[in-house]
Curated annotation (Swiss-Prot):
E.C. number(s) listed in UniProt: 5.1.1.8
Protein name: 4-hydroxyproline 2-epimerase 1
GO molecular function, a single term: 4-hydroxyproline epimerase activity
Keyword check for Electron transport: no
Key word Isomerase present: yes
One Pfam family matching this protein: Pro_racemase
Length: 345
């Protein structure tokens, strides 16, 4: 076989959300920092080509992300990574941080120490401390100390043709989120409503980014609302979530960065204090523990340090390659399985 590019992938899922980890064959990504590398992936044609090669058909699939494992730039980090998705490369993700930690330890890239191994991950949003509980050569669960999370604006009003005026919270949890109480769109969070929730999320994301610009005050490479996360409260008090992802799918996990952003809103409203721990439940019923570890500031704004605890599971090892004569090197997506906005890919 005459392949011009090969990349090795370890398949991992975190509470149902797939995060494949590129552990070999990753080309050198230009940039002196992970934030600069993220910017290159999102602005340079060669960066877009790499992302599309890994994420889109025929090598990729609509579900999940691909994590590019990179050499750490920060002296305190064990590894760096950037998340690739159909829309762009992203700075941070809780479920993908758990997938990457699990991959590093169970593949032996980072030495596993029992009963606990601390792995420091470098992201474009900052350092994430991952504390893994390990037993019998297996990573059983991971507690993430997330980057500082803060409220950009609470109770933002958006006029919509479908649901009238919607109130939402704009918050940062490693990327920017619009957090919407799901009852405002006449739905509940459950498997049967996944397609309707996704469609609503795509509409709201477009409206929000058109009317309410957001930029991180210290990291300009992180801007715009990445996801709309719908939220509700279950009968047992758990926070039920559904994060909607372009071009049209639902996060299978409870969503780490989304719950970090949501915890910032609870803190701002006086509903969460340092030491509190909440349960978050996804659209498929999988769970994270969400904790408020500390208070801090970001560019003078009140902020918090959240923790997210969940599980990662390896389920495969694969290699993707490019035949030099393959006309579909740049990948493609169709609306039949990729979602209503896949025609824009």
């Amino acid at each position: 076989m005459r392949w011009k590019r090969t990349i090795q992938l370890l398949d991992v899922h975190c509470e149902g959300e797939i995060g494949r980890v590129a552990i070999g064959g990753v080309p050198k990504i230009p940039g002196n920092t992970v934030a600069e590398q993220l910017h290159w992936l999102n602005t340079d044609p060669k960066g877009e080509e790499l992302r599309r090669f890994l994420v889109l058909e025929p090598r990729g699939a609509p579900i999940g992300s691909v994590n590019l494992l990179l050499p750490a730039r920060h002296p305190d980090a064990d590894a760096a990574f950037i998340i690739l998705q159909p829309d762009q490369a992203h700075a941070s993700s809780g479920s993908n941080s758990i997938c990457v930690t699990t991959a590093l330890l169970e593949s032996g890239i980072v030495e596993m120490k029992e009963p606990e191994t601390v792995v420091t991950l470098e992201t474009a949003a900052g350092l994430v401390r991952a504390t893994a509980t390990c037993r019998d050569g297996r990573c059983e669960k991971v507690r993430l100390t997330m980057v500082p999370s803060f409220v950009h604006e609470l109770d933002v009003g958006i006029d919509t043709p479908q649901w009238g005026r919607i109130k939402l919270d704009l918050c940062y949890g490693g990327i920017f989120y619009a957090l919407v109480d799901v009852g405002q769109i006449g739905l509940t969070i459950g498997k049967a409503n996944a397609a309707s929730l996704v469609q609503a999320g795509m509409v709201l994301k477009e409206l929000i980014n058109r009317t309410v610009p957001v930029v991180h005050p210290e990291i300009p490479a992180i801007s715009g609302v990445a996801y709309v996360m719908f939220r509700d409260i279950d009968a047992d008090g758990a926070i039920r979530t559904c994060t909607t992802m372009w071009p049209g799918r639902a996060d299978r996990s409870p969503c780490g960065t989304g719950n970090s952003a949501n915890l910032a809103t609870l803190h701002a409203r006086g509903k969460a204090r340092v030491g509190d721990v909440f349960k978050s439940r996804s659209i498929i019923g999988s769970e994270f523990e969400v904790g408020l570890q500390a208070e801090t500031e970001v560019a003078g704004k009140p902020a918090i340090i959240p923790t997210i605890t969940g599980r990662g599971f390896t389920f495969g090892l694969s290699q993707v390659a490019l035949d030099p004569f393959d006309p579909m090197a740049n990948g493609f997506a169709l609306t039949d399985v990729w979602g209503p906005l896949a025609g824009d890919i």
